[in-house]
C-alpha cells in the first residue's frame, strides 16, 4: 500500500508502472492514481467522497411545483443555478411545506463553525479553492505548494454566503456548538447538507430516529463556479495498490493477475463490497457488487459519465490544525458581522505560507 504522493516519491525506484495493467483499464476515474516520473506508480483500491448531500424526494417535489426555478434536479449542474434554487426554496418554505407536506425550515443545514463541524468548511470547502489553484499551477494536487495566491477565494465566499443566507441558523451563533446539521437534515428540515458518504450510515440508522430513508438520499458536487460542467464529487483515499518493481517479472505478473482477480471475481468483489464495506472505483463493481451507499453510487455515476473527481487537496495543508483554526476564527468574525472578508483571505493565504515555513523547518530539524 502507498498512501500518498510523498510516499510514492520515497519508494519511486520500487514501484512498477501500472499504466498497461488490467487494473488501470478497469479504473473508472483515471485521476485516482499516483503518478511518479511519468509512470502510474499506484492505483486506488477504494475511496471516500463528499459533496452536497440532498434530499432527493423533497428536491424533486420542489421541481414539480409551479414557479420552481428548475423542473428537474438534473438542471442543477452549476453554481448559479444551485444558488437560485436554494434562494427560492429558502424564500418559499411555507409554500413548500403546505404543498409537499414537509417540515422544512431551511434550504441548507446549518454551517456550524464549532470544533465538531468547522472541518467541513476550513477543510472540505476550503479544498475547492486549493484544488483549482493547484490545478492551474500544475503542481501535485495532493502535495500542494509552499505559497498560494487565493485565486478562487471569491468563489469560496460565494458558496459560503449561500450556505449562511439560505439557512435558518443565526449567523452570530455558528460557533456556539448548539447546532446539529446532521439532525436538521435527518429530520427533513433541510434540503442540502455539505458532508460525505460516511453520513449514509447514521442518516439511515433507524436507532437515530431520523425521518429520511435511503431512498431520499443522493449527492451532487459542490458547484464552485469554476469548471462546473466537468466537476464530480470530491474523491480521495490513502489506500493505493502498488507493485514491487524489484521483484522478478514472474512475481510481478502473478501479482497483477491476482489484483485483476480481486476486482473481477465474485469472491474478490464480495470481499471488498459486502465484507469490508468499501467502495471500489472499478467498472466491474456492478449488480450485487455495486455499493449500497447512495452517495458512493452518485460518485460512481459521475465518474462513469466522464466527470472529473475533485482531488483531496486539503491533504497538503501545512500544520493543519493551526492553519484551519486561524481560517475558522476569521470566518466566524466575518459571518457574525464583526470582521471583514479580507481577514479570511489573509488567514487563508498568508497563514498558508507561514505554516508551510514552520512545518518544513520542523521537517529539517
Positions of the model-derived regions?
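Short helix-initiation/N-cap motifs at beta->coil->alpha
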Residues: 77-81, 173-187
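Hinge/lid segment of periplasmic solute-binding proteins
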Residues: 1-53, 60, 99-103, 216-222, ...
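Glycine-centered hinge/linker elements that transmit conformational signals in sensory
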Residues: 83-87, 136-175, 222
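A local structural motif
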Residues: 66-73, 145-148, 161-176, 189, ...
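Extracytoplasmic/periplasmic solute-binding protein
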Residues: 35-45, 50, 80-144, 190
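C-terminal capping/gating helix-and-loop segments adjacent to ligand/active sites or protein-protein/ligand interfaces
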Residues: 235, 278, 283-284, 298-358
Amino acid at each position: 500500500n502507498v498512501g500518498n504522493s510523498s510516499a510514492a516519491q520515497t519508494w519511486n525506484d520500487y514501484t512498477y508502472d501500472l499504466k498497461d495493467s488490467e487494473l488501470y483499464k478497469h479504473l473508472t476515474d483515471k485521476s485516482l492514481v499516483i503518478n511518479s516520473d511519468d509512470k502510474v506508480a499506484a492505483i486506488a483500491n477504494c475511496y471516500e467522497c463528499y459533496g452536497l448531500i440532498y434530499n432527493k424526494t423533497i428536491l424533486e417535489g420542489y421541481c414539480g411545483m409551479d414557479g420552481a426555478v428548475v423542473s428537474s434536479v438534473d438542471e442543477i449542474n452549476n453554481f448559479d443555478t444551485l444558488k437560485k434554487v436554494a434562494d427560492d426554496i429558502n424564500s418559499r418554505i411555507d409554500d413548500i411545506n403546505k404543498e409537499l407536506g414537509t417540515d422544512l425550515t431551511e434550504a441548507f443545514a446549518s454551517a456550524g463553525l464549532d470544533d465538531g463541524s468547522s472541518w467541513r468548511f476550513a477543510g472540505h470547502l476550503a479544498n475547492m479553492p486549493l484544488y483549482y489553484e493547484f490545478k492551474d499551477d500544475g503542481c501535485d494536487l495532493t502535495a500542494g505548494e509552499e505559497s498560494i495566491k487565493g485565486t478562487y477565494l471569491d468563489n469560496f465566499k460565494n458558496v459560503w454566503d449561500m450556505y449562511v443566507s439560505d439557512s435558518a441558523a443565526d449567523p452570530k451563533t455558528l460557533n456556539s456548538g448548539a447546532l446539529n446539521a446532521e439532525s436538521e437534515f435527518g429530520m427533513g428540515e433541510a434540503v442540502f447538507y455539505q458532508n460525505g458518504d460516511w453520513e449514509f450510515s447514521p442518516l439511515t440508522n433507524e436507532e437515530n430516529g431520523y425521518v429520511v430513508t435511503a431512498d431520499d438520499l443522493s449527492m451532487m458536487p459542490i458547484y464552485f463556479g469554476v469548471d462546473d460542467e466537468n466537476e464530480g464529487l470530491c474523491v480521495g483515499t490513502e489506500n493505493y495498490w502498488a507493485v514491487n518493481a524489484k521483484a522478478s517479472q514472474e512475481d510481478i505478473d502473478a501479482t497483477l493477475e491476482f489484483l485483476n482477480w480481486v476486482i473481477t471475481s465474485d469472491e474478490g468483489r464480495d470481499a471488498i463490497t459486502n465484507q469490508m464495506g468499501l467502495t471500489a472505483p472499478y467498472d466491474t463493481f456492478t449488480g450485487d457488487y455495486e455499493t449500497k451507499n447512495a452517495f458512493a453510487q452518485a460518485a460512481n455515476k459521475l465518474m462513469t459519465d466522464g466527470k472529473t473527481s475533485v482531488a483531496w487537496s486539503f491533504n497538503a495543508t501545512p500544520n493543519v490544525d493551526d492553519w484551519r483554526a486561524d481560517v475558522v476564527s476569521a470566518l466566524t468574525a466575518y459571518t457574525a458581522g464583526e470582521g471583514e472578508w479580507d481577514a479570511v483571505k489573509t488567514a487563508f493565504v498568508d497563514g498558508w505560507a507561514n505554516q508551510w515555513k514552520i512545518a518544513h523547518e520542523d521537517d529539517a530539524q
